[in-house]
Amino acid sequence: MQNVGIVGLGLIGGSLAKTIKLHTPYTVYGTEKNADTMRRAFLMEAIDGELTAETLPQCDVVLICLYPQGIIDYVTAHAADFKPDSLVIDCGGVKQVICDALFPVSQRYAWHFIGGHPMA
């Protein structure tokens, strides 16, 4: 494993980015709709680069740190872009609706979905 992508750099995603950067040799790519948060992530060296259409297919693990519907929307919109055999992990606090929507999507593509939880 070499590259980690993080979608959403708020409290959960930002904390994960900083911890991964501090304790691993992995390259961390991140994306955040709030421009100030994105700028801070770069300034704090929580990410190495922006998660884009070019960098997403390079990621071995992608952590999705959004609200439940945002997780579903992002993963379904980018389902064909994830690297084959990569792990796509949601970090939302609700499981049933997310897992019901995304396990079938992951089965159509060559990546693996994990319904995670930031507190468990």
Locations of the language-model features?
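Rossmann-like NAD(P)-binding element
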Residues: E54-F82, S86-I89
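Rossmann-like NAD(P)(H) cofactor-binding subdomain of soluble oxidoreductases
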Residues: A77-A120
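Structured loop/turn residues at beta-strand edges in well-structured enzyme cores
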Residues: E45, P57, R108-W111
